[in-house]
């Protein structure tokens, strides 16, 4: 947006004030305008209007309304010089966080200062909507010596687009053609692999046994019988000699404990071997014989249940109706008494 105020009494226009990019470069302009306004106030007090150069704005919020400007000029008040939005400044390029959306970088050197400080970096950044989807252009404007500007465009492509390899990085073509291999090793087919179950044995071999608790599921707690659960002497009348009672307790417990250990030492491994075969045989019969036969029988009975009512209605019932009709006229004759003549026998002529 551009605005320009002219004097009503003067026909000639003043020369335009030079334009600047940053706010720091407008200090000299402000001092010159103050001196010129003070000199013009003594000669043209009734028609005093402060001259403003051509100002540039970035946003609408920075622009004052025209009524406020005329009100201040009518009251001989100084209209403040519009200031441009300051851009973030950094000491070096490494301090910039969001380098993805940077469109312009300007490096300013401290020419007027005798202090040896690092140049300041001013970042000009566009909005996200103004940046392309596939690439970001970064313009570096460096002025280490003077105010000369060098534009060095650099395009950073998105990582999803593969970049072509440099000719030097490409592998050189082979000088000699390699001979084709006659033997090819095909990976083994897991469906046809002869697996004897080594993976299933591994958890058993590395299993750590709990030597203190050998009945983790409490399935044989009824075997925990002691001497006092088997032998009891209820009253003094049935008390045996003290040494007999004491030695009986010790002998019973010791013999029971060591007899079990000796029996397990002799027959434990054999019974474990036979038990493994027996349970494996039962599992084999259940998986490969009993269960298939059970499934087959259930399938057959399901078909019989559908056919049986029709068999009873259309075959069995008519058959027994016919048998009942045949034997319903049966008569029993005895040698004693009057002979019973059937109905159809009355019409038969005997020769």
UniProtKB/Swiss-Prot annotation:
<feature type="compositionally biased region" description="Low complexity">
    <location>
        <begin position="167"/>
        <end position="184"/>
    </location>
</feature>
<dbReference type="GO" id="GO:0016324">
    <property type="term" value="C:apical plasma membrane"/>
</dbReference>
<dbReference type="GO" id="GO:0000139">
    <property type="term" value="C:Golgi membrane"/>
</dbReference>
<comment type="subunit">
    <text>Homooligomer.</text>
</comment>
<keyword id="KW-0472">Membrane</keyword>
<dbReference type="Pfam" id="PF01146">
    <property type="entry name" value="Caveolin"/>
</dbReference>
<feature type="compositionally biased region" description="Basic residues">
    <location>
        <begin position="38"/>
        <end position="51"/>
    </location>
</feature>
<dbReference type="GO" id="GO:0005901">
    <property type="term" value="C:caveola"/>
</dbReference>
<comment type="function">
    <text>May act as a scaffolding protein within caveolar membranes. Interacts directly with G-protein alpha subunits and can regulate their activity. Thought to have a role in the uptake of lipids and proteins in the intestinal cells; operates in the apical uptake of lipid markers and trafficking of yolk proteins. Affects fecundity and egg laying.</text>
</comment>
<protein>
    <recommendedName>
        <fullName>Caveolin-2</fullName>
    </recommendedName>
</protein>
<feature type="intramembrane region" description="Helical">
    <location>
        <begin position="262"/>
        <end position="290"/>
    </location>
</feature>
<feature type="region of interest" description="Disordered">
    <location>
        <begin position="71"/>
        <end position="93"/>
    </location>
</feature>
<feature type="compositionally biased region" description="Acidic residues">
    <location>
        <begin position="22"/>
        <end position="31"/>
    </location>
</feature>
<keyword id="KW-1003">Cell membrane</keyword>
<keyword id="KW-0333">Golgi apparatus</keyword>
<dbReference type="GO" id="GO:0005319">
    <property type="term" value="F:lipid transporter activity"/>
</dbReference>
<feature type="region of interest" description="Disordered">
    <location>
        <begin position="1"/>
        <end position="55"/>
    </location>
</feature>
<dbReference type="InterPro" id="IPR001612">
    <property type="entry name" value="Caveolin"/>
</dbReference>
<feature type="compositionally biased region" description="Polar residues">
    <location>
        <begin position="1"/>
        <end position="14"/>
    </location>
</feature>
<dbReference type="GO" id="GO:0070836">
    <property type="term" value="P:caveola assembly"/>
</dbReference>
<feature type="topological domain" description="Cytoplasmic">
    <location>
        <begin position="1"/>
        <end position="261"/>
    </location>
</feature>
<dbReference type="GO" id="GO:0007567">
    <property type="term" value="P:parturition"/>
</dbReference>
<dbReference type="GO" id="GO:0007166">
    <property type="term" value="P:cell surface receptor signaling pathway"/>
</dbReference>
<feature type="topological domain" description="Cytoplasmic">
    <location>
        <begin position="291"/>
        <end position="351"/>
    </location>
</feature>
<dbReference type="GO" id="GO:0046662">
    <property type="term" value="P:regulation of egg-laying behavior"/>
</dbReference>
<feature type="region of interest" description="Disordered">
    <location>
        <begin position="144"/>
        <end position="193"/>
    </location>
</feature>
<comment type="similarity">
    <text>Belongs to the caveolin family.</text>
</comment>
<dbReference type="GO" id="GO:0060090">
    <property type="term" value="F:molecular adaptor activity"/>
</dbReference>
